[in-house]
Amino acid sequence: MALYAVDKPLHLTSHDVVEEARRRLSTRRVGHTGTLDPLATGLLLLVTNESTKLVPFLSGEDKEYIAWVSFGATTPTLDAEGPISEEAPARFDRKDLEAALPRFLEVREQVPPLYSAIKVGGKRAYEAAREGKPLALGPRPVRYLEVELLAFDPEPIPHPIAPSARGWRLAERRGRPVRLPRPLGAYPTAVVRLVVGPGTYVRAFARDLGEMLGTKAFLSGLVRTRVGRVGLERAVALSDLSPEKAIPELDVLPFPVVELSHTEARRVLEGMPLPIPAMGYVTLVDSKRRLLAIAEGDGFKLKIRRVFAKEA
């Protein structure tokens, strides 16, 4: 089993990355744990072959982003694809911005962008929007876990970024370079660090932040810096992707690890429950720390949810 962390280049779709990974890794069985828009860069976690079975256990992971939000205008797609569709005065200062951001920690619902992959009645929202017949999208549950202002600039500036004990942030000296889309204008721009739950659209966050501040806003740049336990510092350039760059699955899975005896391992491979008093999901390994299965506990026993090994 193999997983790979790739730094998605600007302008490529997530599918473009998957296609290139298939070529470089010599396998058709390649997927990812969560898409990135073409105008976003950063961490795309790829799964291959047997590790594709891990996707249901990884797609709910929290994600960290650094977002560039430009104020005073908006676009149909809510990002820098353009064109500018509406402008509005941005009459607020840094203190107003700092006061608005913590309010997102109480937000529990979000209306997705009209240009999104959500399906309604078998039709993708972005397809309907491009046809001039936008769908009525209702609010969906979201979670904002951390929202932090990193900078407030007179225009989008591609600050370098670096990891820290408190998440990724702007680098004081040398850091990882950032590529932003072509600016749509010299609009005042906030750089915001976000940690969010699954299903959260950062483009919609930009729209909603603008509304909180009495203006229009759009996402002028985005870098994904973490997916669950994997940070952007572990990502390789797509041009450097090779089988040797794999990440061990135990570094990625978010569940407690339970090491089994040989007898217990045999029971797992037969799909039999184990009398181990654990709660929630756990990762089961053998004495050599090889992944055997993922199980779910009810406090009395473990029920096997997915077996990966063929022998113990």
Curated annotation (Swiss-Prot):
Any one GO BP annotation for this protein: mRNA pseudouridine synthesis
UniProt keyword list: Isomerase, tRNA processing
Residues of the active site: D37 (nucleophile)
Transmembrane segments annotated in the record for this chain: none
Keyword Oxidoreductase set for record: no
SUPFAM superfamilies to which the protein is assigned, alphabetical: Pseudouridine synthase
CDD domains reported for this sequence: PseudoU_synth_EcTruB
InterPro entries xref list: PsdUridine_synth_cat_dom_sf (IPR020103), PsdUridine_synth_N (IPR002501), tRNA_psdUridine_synth_TruB (IPR014780)
Entry's EC annotation: 5.4.99.25
Keyword Isomerase: yes
Single annotated GO MF: RNA binding
Gene3D superfamilies per the UniProt record, alphabetical: Pseudouridine synthase
Catalyses which reaction(s): uridine(55) in tRNA = pseudouridine(55) in tRNA
Enzyme class label: isomerase
Function text: Responsible for synthesis of pseudouridine from uracil-55 in the psi GC loop of transfer RNAs.
Family listed: Belongs to the pseudouridine synthase TruB family. Type 1 subfamily.
HAMAP family found in the cross-reference section: TruB_bact (MF_01080)
Protein name per its UniProtKB record: tRNA pseudouridine synthase B
Organism for this UniProt entry: Thermus thermophilus (strain ATCC 27634 / DSM 579 / HB8)
Gene encoding the protein: truB
